[in-house]
Amino acid sequence: MALRSAAVAALLGVAHTSLAQLTSTCGSRFPWEDNQLTDAVVASSNATLFGFGADADPSAKILPQPRCKLLPGDPQWPSQTVWNLFNLTLGGALIKNTPLAAPCYNNWPGVANPAACETVRTRWNDPYFHVDDPSSAMFPLYQGRTCMPTEDPSASNCTLGGYASYSVAVTKVSHIQLALNFARNANLRLVVRNTGHDFADKSIGAGALSVWTHKLKDIQFLSNYNCRGYNGPAFKIGSGVETEELYQAAEARNLTVVGGECRTVGIAGGYIAGGGHSPMSSLVGMGADQVLSLDVVLPSGRFVTVNRDAYPDLFWALRGGGGSTFGVVTSVTLAAYPKIPVTTMTFAFLTSPNVTADTFWAGVRTYMSYFDTFTAAGAYGYFLVVGIGPGQYLFNFMPMWGGNMTRPQFETLVNPFLTDLANLGIDVTPNITEYPSLYSAHSGTFPPEQVGAADSHAASRLFPKENFQPAKINETLAAVRYAIEDGAILIGYNIRSAPNPKVNQTNSVNPAWRKTTGFFILATAWAPDSPDSVIQSQSEKLTTDWMERWREVSPGAGSYMSEGDINEPNFQQSFYGEYYPRLLAIKKKYDPRGLFYAPTAVGSEEWTVQGQVPWIPTQNGRLCRV
């Protein structure tokens, strides 16, 4: 595994010199995308650890592969000399990871620091704190909870657990190519991390080499993108761009774009790969529908542009078929729309001496009966239903959102609903506000997200509109009520994936989204210091009791992979629907050696993480083929 000095010199040239000057057919690549590893450089270096893999070829013979990926301490694990040389080829972009909460523990000499620990404890629930770290996870339950903030530095030890051993802080395409080639040739587990937003912690893995795309922040405005059936404004963004950053860029151009509800979601990462729901979805469709072109590093290490005409199978798969599966997206070009007004409404109602539990649930049923009406008008609802005491419940709009609606138009839409609530004896005082744009509405109404806790487990269901029509609404409500009365928490969305002829909606977004008007997330929670037995019991109940009732009242529907249950039964059907066989074939075509793995991703059923606790599947074990 030794590298000759000539190899290092040649590969160092990749890190500092633009070796390829290619221009995409529609719009140009970012300058750092032209900094690529080439066959000539690999050949001149004689560095086999960084050589490309075989291009996609169904007839190519794949040699037998090791059953398991390496972990630190294995005899074949790269020596520190090799890691140092790898860092040289990257121009110093390699990071040896330290858990974010390590300053709170004495077993990290040189890192333990009371003042730094206080910062960790203060900011642990702040998503930006985790986004800016190369290895942290926003939802640490499946990391193994091996290094949580503590006030007692001697109480226990902090370990990496499910965090990656090393990360590459990507600033150019050659960084990704070198990382993929090194991981493939050295038999290392590979993970891809953008912001760390995923309920199943797809961006972590014990002993892994992580490709960290957070620094790819470029945004290019294309005023007249006229290519492959689309004609209009567009934005080309690096894969590190977050929702809030894209919204700000569109605001500066008096435009509207499709992005997430959470400010720190990475648009070109798992958001688009998972389909991407948005406050704009009821108007113009899913986030993945807006994609016009992508630039991607394939599992072979090759860098390609993917669109309707080039790699059409990947163009279909990358828009909804799941992240950490087909390659590493470096940038994406997205459709944009004219600036629109947005009117929002917030209110809450709860049980009281005048509102019985049955009346409360009648109010929830009333709202559900308007789901199709509201989404057909382009509206979107974000709400919470939770128990607040024995037989007591709260409903809270956070908010309802009327895209491309003035206040009078919005009030015309919602007044019949408010009247129906009043007729039940539920009097609410709605706070209705008209905003001039999506960005101002998003900033003014959506609460900041809270992350970092390991005290809950969530699952989700994509309910089709039939579930909220007279024949099935009572059955649906009963399944929801059962879970809430048993202690569950519901975060709901009244949303649809609107048809949109302006963009290409022939993609791999879960077909269940195209029929959905109710996307419901159900969570169970426990005390932060609960033992594994409590977490196991609650997680099992969520999956096999509460969610099973939801599956029974919505046969053939699905779940949203990015906010789904890591224990989802038959995840292939739930997260991918009828598209799974096609997606699996594309996966095997472009990644025959299984370089990319993530829990519940396409092809993940062929792998297992060893040493799992039932119902709490962490990523802190060895990854092996089944």
Task: Show where each model-derived region lies.
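Fungal secretory targeting signals
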Residues: 1-22
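Soluble FAD-dependent oxygen oxidases
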Residues: 19-626
